């Protein structure tokens, strides 16, 4: 269901697209931070609500009645998950440029849109621009981290080499969707060309993949070294699971998703080995801390279900060898003993 007024602004240059689900506590602050942007150009705010049942829809309707000239609502009949919610909302947006904002984040400055759009308007070779942000603890309000610097090959190259940098995490932090603005036409072309990534979102959580791959293949990334957005850190989120095993499987899903991307784009065996070697080292470190080496080995071996060839089998053999996992097992046991002793001493 789409709720929009006939008074909705005509020909917006940029659309702020907000994806939300059961975030009634935060959504008004998010929406208002977008509606109150001070811009010399027309803009709209499009909210995609993914089947909320916590009173969020009623709140959004009241806001839409008050700000009918700028606010458009899209209510999904059922929960579609984050990626498909964004795809649907962006398709309904009318702006040349799309700025995305998660339902619990918000803009810190009134000219965030002006700064983001200015980069795209004046740099045709840039497909996506993102800015700095700070993360804060939702319970205490304490600022946890301030990020106003971004270094990556993605600033200078496009195409396969840019995607390689993306998949290898070749940057100091992942581009934050809530501080990003990009060209709508490139995104929609990517949704057709790389539709497999949308389908994979039903299996692996990684809503930024279809966006970042599409943008990296078509242009360079831009960056604004200023705090534009506040990123809220919650106790529970899509990344939060009841057990450490569930959490590890979730994290390892990103490794599998990267392999799917590499296969889809016909990466060379050397590129695939580079991606997997880097990401598996990260997962091994996670497994050590959580004492989940057996699960790590099982997940690494499951990569054959995606692609079974000489390269993958070599990667599996090298990353599950005794020389790799034995030191990890020992460290994992030491971490567990240390954690146990801490609990005993607290009592």
For each predicted feature, which ranges?
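N-proximal low-complexity "stem/linker" segments adjacent to membrane-targeting elements
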Residues: 1-33
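Short, acidic, metal-binding catalytic loop of nucleotide-sugar glycosyltransferases
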Residues: 32-42
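A conserved acidic beta->alpha catalytic loop
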Residues: 49-58, 78, 102
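Glycine-rich, basic loop-to-helix element that forms the pyrophosphate-binding segment
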Residues: 76-93
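Short aromatic/hydrophobic "clamp" motif used to bind/position activated sugar donors
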Residues: 98
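Conserved donor NDP-sugar-binding/catalytic core segment of glycosyltransferases
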Residues: 111-146
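Conserved nucleotide-sugar donor-binding catalytic segment
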Residues: 148-244
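Catalytic core of nucleotide-sugar-dependent glycosyltransferases
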Residues: 160, 203-204, 227-235, 240-270, ...
């Amino acid at each position: 269901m789409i709720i929009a007024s006939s008074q909705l602004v005509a020909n917006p240059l940029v659309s702020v697209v907000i994806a939300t689900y059961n975030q009634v506590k935060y959504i008004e602050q998010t929406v208002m931070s977008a509606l109150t942007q001070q811009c010399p150009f027309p803009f709209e705010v499009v909210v995609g609500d993914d089947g909320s049942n916590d009173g969020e829809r009623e709140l959004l309707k009241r806001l839409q009645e008050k700000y009918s000239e700028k606010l458009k609502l899209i209510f999904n009949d059922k929960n579609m998950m984050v990626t498909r919610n964004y795809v649907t909302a962006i398709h309904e947006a009318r702006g040349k440029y799309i700025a995305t904002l998660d339902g619990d984040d918000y803009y810190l400055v009134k000219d965030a849109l002006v700064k983001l759009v200015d980069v795209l308007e004046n740099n045709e070779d840039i497909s996506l621009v993102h800015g700095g942000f700070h993360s804060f603890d939702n319970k205490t309000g304490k600022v946890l981290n301030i990020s106003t610097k971004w270094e990556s090959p993605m600033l200078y190259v496009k195409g396969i080499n840019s995607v390689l940098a993306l998949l290898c995490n070749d940057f100091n932090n992942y581009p934050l969707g809530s501080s990003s603005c990009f060209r709508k036409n490139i995104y929609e072309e990517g949704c057709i060309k790389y539709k497999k990534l949308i389908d994979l979102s039903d299996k692996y959580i990684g809503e930024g993949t279809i966006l970042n791959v599409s943008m990296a293949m078509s242009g360079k990334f831009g960056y604004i070294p200023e705090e534009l957005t506040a990123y809220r850190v919650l106790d529970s989120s899509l990344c939060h699971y009841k057990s450490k095993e569930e959490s590890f499987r979730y994290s390892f899903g990103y490794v599998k998703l990267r392999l799917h991307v590499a296969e889809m784009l016909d990466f060379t065996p050397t590129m695939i080995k580079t991606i997997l070697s880097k990401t598996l080292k990260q997962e091994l470190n996670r497994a050590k801390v959580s004492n989940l080496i057996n699960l790590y080995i099982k997940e690494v071996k499951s990569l054959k279900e995606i692609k079974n060839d000489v390269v993958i089998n070599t990667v599996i053999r090298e990353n599950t060898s005794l020389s790799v996992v034995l030191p990890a097992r020992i460290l994992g046991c030491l971490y567990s003993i240390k954690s146990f002793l801490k609990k005993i001493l607290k009592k």
